[in-house]
């Protein structure tokens, strides 16, 4: 299983994880999710030969693609972090 962060320039960064993916039902729903949820779309993605659901979060200068089950946080310094849900270990920080 991977999270793929797609820059507008076309660079791919893969983060390997054994966890299934991004969940809508985060409680409480963070403010940043409300702000960007109108600019998202759901799509099917092939990962290691298996079709899975993914969510594209469209940012000003790129796309953050996350699988249901991960937590994603956006911070005041315009960075985005992707966390594993079981221990909130930060997998990756993306500066936007």
Q: Which residues are covered by each model-predicted region?
A:
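N-terminal non-globular leader segments, chiefly Sec-dependent signal peptides
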Residues: 2-59
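Short, compact, well-ordered microdomains
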Residues: 61-96
